[in-house]
Amino acid sequence: MVTLSLTPELLAKLQSRQPLLWVNPRLGQPLPASAPSLELIAAAEARLARCAPLMAALFPELASSHGQVESQLMPATGLQYALGEGAEGAWFIKRDDQLPTAGSIKARGGFHEVLAIAESIAIEHGMLDPDGDRRVLATEAARKLFSQYSVTVGSTGNLGLSIGVMAAALGFDAVVHMSADAKAWKKDRLRKRGVRVVEHEGDYAQAVAAGREQALGATRCHFVDDERSALLFFGYAAAARHLARQLAEAGRVVDAAHPLFVYLPCGVGGAPGGITYGLKALLGDHVHCFFAEPVASPCVLVQLASGSDDPVSVYDIGLDNRTDADGLAVGQASHLVSPLMASQLAGVFTVPDDQLYVQLLALKTSMGVEVEPSAAAGIGGPGWLRDSPEGRAYVRDHGLDMRDATHVIWATGGSLVPREELHRFQAYATALAHVPGAMHKAA
């Protein structure tokens, strides 16, 4: 068993699945020399903008947004008061659960990578001028070209939906390797879109490894590597500028006297890591990003707290990576993201499965918003800062005035979840509410 430099107290809490807030002691240190250029964020923004007409042509549900894949920033005063947080600061929900077509945060990175692949192939074959109209990628000639290529990914569910739907829409042979904890409805939805789904008995890492292995032995096959992909990462990072605009439109200033806190559910780390990277590049020390991970799967926490440059997994400390938050059921953090988050991430808090349902129910009853369990992981973030010794110390050490703070809780998925599944989530959460002590807050 690997313990590395985890303190005995932290290790004991992790192994006993005790909810906790870990504050990153390396926040604010320089990025590693190998860090990707921030110019790649602008490149991703530009790609998504020039492909917007193509997206509107491919997906009728994007017509009203002119092909922009973006989500609402929703005031969350109802949730704030339902959880007894008082009036300190302003709360918002970032509604990536409503992102069109893919229904989750994974649309940001997944769509961006598939669009980049399609552009590259079309330019290489003389079908697309570098400055040309991207709607040519939706023509029959383009579909015939793309059908000669496959796009493969390994996923617990939501990234597979994103990649599979986008690749199939363009005519690629789309293959999604899915882990044992992937939900049946996600597999069914992909198959209905013409995507080949390969099921595996192992966990997320094994599904990714299987996809990578298939791609190595194939010609004209692009493997979307959730653990290492820069194209995914910068697709997520491109969300930062739009969020900044939304905050400005809501009258929320972000500066030294008006700090911004962002709470992001975390699986392998690509989506929350990319968004954090983009926000820190844009807003610097004025934004404080925290990841939320299941108590059974705190892979980024374990990796960063270990202080090791070598991969460390939750299995190394005796955890089993079994959680109802299927999108967050990842045992080992991204090899690309972890070194970057070592200096950018404020901290990580962990959430038991029952608490996910408690928070899911609070969101439903206070605001009428229905999400899947993993998407509710970030809701406890403000409470950790207010109520825990670690959170209060973070606020004090950074000289933050919480009265004028803005809190953004990122809801990562849920709009595509079948109605019967949503009812099951709510029923279980309601039953929990009648169990003594079940409604306590994680902090």
Curated annotation (Swiss-Prot):
Family recorded in the similarity comment: Belongs to the serine/threonine dehydratase family. DsdA subfamily.
Keywords: Lyase, Pyridoxal phosphate
Organism lineage string: Bacteria, Pseudomonadati, Pseudomonadota, Betaproteobacteria, Burkholderiales
Modification type N6-(pyridoxal phosphate)lysine: residues: K106
Organism: Cupriavidus pinatubonensis (strain JMP 134 / LMG 1197) (Cupriavidus necator (strain JMP 134))
GO biological process: D-serine catabolic process; isoleucine biosynthetic process
Gene3D superfamilies xref list: 3.40.50.1100
Name this protein carries in UniProt: Probable D-serine dehydratase
Enzyme class, broadest EC rank: lyase
EC number of the protein: 4.3.1.18
HAMAP family assigned to the protein according to its UniProt record, in alphabetical order: D_Ser_dehydrat
InterPro entries named in the record: D_Ser_am_lyase (IPR011780), Ser/Thr_Dehydratase (IPR050147), TrpB-like_PALP (IPR001926), TrpB-like_PALP_sf (IPR036052)
The UniProt record lists the keyword Lyase: yes
One Gene Ontology MF term: pyridoxal phosphate binding
PANTHER family assigned: D-SERINE DEHYDRATASE, THREONINE DEHYDRATASE, MITOCHONDRIAL-RELATED
Cofactor or coenzyme needed: pyridoxal 5'-phosphate
Reaction equation(s) it catalyzes: D-serine = pyruvate + NH4(+)
Domain of life, source organism: Bacteria
One Pfam short name: PALP
